């Protein structure tokens, strides 16, 4: 399931310019962890629309790749509609701790569905670039970001760097930053890709992670989509289909965006 960073020459260039990129298999999840993930993904609290996206988002495989365990302290960054939250919250309920770094409006979603979201331990005020601190240093086992980084880069490269630094600070040594993002073409101009397409080149994000102090512990193709040409705005693809109706069938045939799935570790 591990992959080249983009193509072999990109891996070589990244290694020469940025330092060694480790590609290590994460520890295999236990049977109990797999059972909890399967129960959460098939839970009746998840809507049919959310479940329909599993074919593109691969939640069980993605969280296994990151090494999620039910006794971890996990911070999810900017959960949006809570697609991953409704999976994470039940898995971490009994023995772990889930914190959501979001704006205060996410509290309304928790109140609306306490049976699922009531297990969340805390909402951390998080509004880059104004608020990026995630908590006490060395306090979290894992931080997760699902398709958020282009928003930080759209604000500025400094905002993206500040978020990475905040994640690094809050993680314990050995802690994991599980990262998924819409992928731009290799060596595309990062800021322009973020602004126009809501995508970022993979080599750019790896460079930011290494500069922050992370090592790259794993790179996976779990969420890759070779049908995606990587040169169109991701919102034209499912599920948004924001373009004209005449192109919807074409976009549906492509599926959701091609996405990088990276595992960064704090030494």
Please place each PLM-identified region on the residue numbering.
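A short acidic, Gly/Pro-enriched loop at the edge of an enzyme's catalytic core
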Residues: 132-144
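Conserved beta-strand signature within the Rossmann-like core of class I S-adenosyl-L-methionine
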Residues: 174-181
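Conserved SAM-binding loop of SAM-dependent methyltransferases across substrates and taxa
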Residues: 81-93
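Class I SAM-dependent methyltransferase Rossmann-like catalytic core
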Residues: 33-70
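Conserved class I S-adenosyl-L-methionine
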Residues: 70-80
């Amino acid at each position: 399931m591990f992959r080249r960073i983009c193509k072999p020459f990109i891996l070589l260039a990244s290694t020469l310019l940025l330092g060694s990129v480790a590609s290590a298999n994460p520890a295999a999840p236990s049977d109990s962890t797999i059972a909890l993930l399967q129960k959460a993904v098939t839970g009746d609290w998840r809507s049919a629309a959310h479940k329909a996206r599993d074919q593109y988002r691969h939640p069980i495989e993605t969280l296994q790749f990151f090494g999620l365990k039910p006794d971890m302290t996990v911070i999810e960054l900017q959960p949006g509609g809570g697609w991953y939250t409704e999976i994470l919250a039940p898995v971490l309920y009994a023995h772990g701790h889930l914190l959501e770094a979001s704006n205060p409006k996410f509290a309304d979603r928790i109140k609306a569905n306490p049976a699922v979201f009531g297990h969340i331990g805390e909402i951390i005020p998080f509004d880059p670039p104004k608020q990026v601190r995630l908590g006490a240093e060395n306090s979290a086992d894992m931080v997760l970001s699902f398709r958020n980084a282009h928003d930080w880069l759209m604000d500025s490269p400094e905002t993206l760097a500040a978020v990475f630094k905040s994640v690094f600070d809050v993680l314990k040594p050995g802690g994991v930053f599980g990262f998924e993002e819409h992928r731009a073409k290799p060596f595309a101009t990062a800021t322009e890709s973020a602004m126009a397409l809501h995508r970022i080149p993979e080599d750019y994000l790896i460079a930011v992670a290494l500069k922050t102090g992370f090592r790259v512990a794993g790179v996976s193709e779990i969420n890759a989509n070779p049908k995606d040409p990587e040169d169109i705005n991701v919102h034209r693809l499912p599920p948004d289909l924001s373009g004209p109706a005449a192109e919807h069938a074409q976009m549906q045939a492509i599926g959701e965006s091609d996405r990088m799935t990276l595992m960064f570790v704090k030494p």
